């Protein structure tokens, strides 16, 4: 047996979008208001990331990821620059005085003032805000520039933009590329006759069922990892109208290619999907996820 096409078509549908957008706008209004503790608040870039930004959210999703990016300063990686380029870089920029930790504390104080301290919880990677309908995971960060070239003029400088922040417990740095993730997801969706994102929603709903049945835990796979896993599946496997046939073919491809996980990349195309960093998945959990999907599929 396989999961009926009618059920898969329902699972492929997108959940609510307006309320998360309203929540983002509310948080932006709070952080940019005159009462805000943030310095240079006119240089903030506040945007959705994750499922709601990428249009892969499903019914019943409640966590809204909101990036609060300060462009007043930035982190950078200049390891790919030539010696003469690094010299120009060092002569161009001064050491920042408004550090990320000061920025994060200013964001926390402002959110606590606006929403009440009891509704603001400081997590390891984000600041959680509890509202009546949704939970917002606010991520204070600076821009991260991965420089590819650096000359005397702006025209001679090229970098890949991302974000960087640190964990609360150990102060470990996390670098990610949410805007790249979004752009490449849109491109793949267009190349696959707009079946890529609905298929992601199907896999997210299957994950939801697996957790409900206690076959896996939430820690085994995140929504981000599901998107990046499916990003590695060749486009032709998504270009199938019938959802049952499409999911079956994709699942078969993933099962046959588990030995190639080391070559898989994240949807942002800036790092490998599997590894030991905070931003990467481990192959054991991915194997478990695929095994349980196959079992769930065959037992339906």
UniProtKB/Swiss-Prot annotation:
Modulation of this protein's activity = Binds to and probably activated by a virus-derived, approximately 400 nucleotide RNA (called CBASS-activating bacteriophage RNA, cabRNA) that begins in the viral terminase subunit terS and extends into terL, as well as by a shorter RNA with part of the cabRNA sequence able to form a hairpin. RNA secondary and/or tertiary structure, as well as viral infection itself, are important for CdnE activation.
Under the heading CDD domains, the entry gives: NT_2-5OAS_ClassI-CCAase (cd05400)
UniProt keyword Metal-binding present: yes
The free-text note explaining how the cofactor binds reads: Binds 1 Mg(2+) ion per subunit.
Supply the InterPro entries for this chain: NT_2-5OAS_ClassI-CCAase, NT_sf, Polymerase_NTP_transf_dom
Biological process per Gene Ontology, one example term:
defense response to virus
Report keywords, A-Z: Antiviral defense, Magnesium, Metal-binding, Nucleotide-binding, Nucleotidyltransferase, RNA-binding, Transferase
Positions bound to Mg(2+):
63, 65, 137
Q: Does the keyword RNA-binding apply?
A: yes
Q: Which GO terms describe its molecular function?
A: metal ion binding; nucleotide binding; nucleotidyltransferase activity; RNA binding
- Co-factor(s): Mg(2+)
The protein's matches in Pfam families, at most eight in alphabetical order, are given as:
NTP_transf_2
EC numbers = 2.7.7.-
Family per similarity comment: Belongs to the CD-NTase family. E01 subfamily.
Protein function: Cyclic nucleotide synthase (second messenger synthase) of a CBASS antivirus system. CBASS (cyclic oligonucleotide-based antiphage signaling system) provides immunity against bacteriophage. The CD-NTase protein synthesizes cyclic nucleotides in response to infection; these serve as specific second messenger signals. The signals activate a diverse range of effectors, leading to bacterial cell death and thus abortive phage infection. A type I-B CBASS system. Protects S.aureus against phage infection. When the CBASS operon (cdnE and the following gene) is introduced in S.aureus strain RN4220 there is strong protection against lytic DNA phages 80alpha-vir and phi-NM1-gamma-6 but little to no protection against phages phi-NM4-gamma-4 or phi-12-gamma-3.
Please give the name of this protein. Answer: Cyclic nucleotide synthase CdnE01
Q: Which organism is it from?
A: Staphylococcus haemolyticus
- Lineage of producing organism: Bacteria, Bacillati, Bacillota, Bacilli, Bacillales
Per UniProt, what is the name of the gene that codes for the protein in this document? cdnE
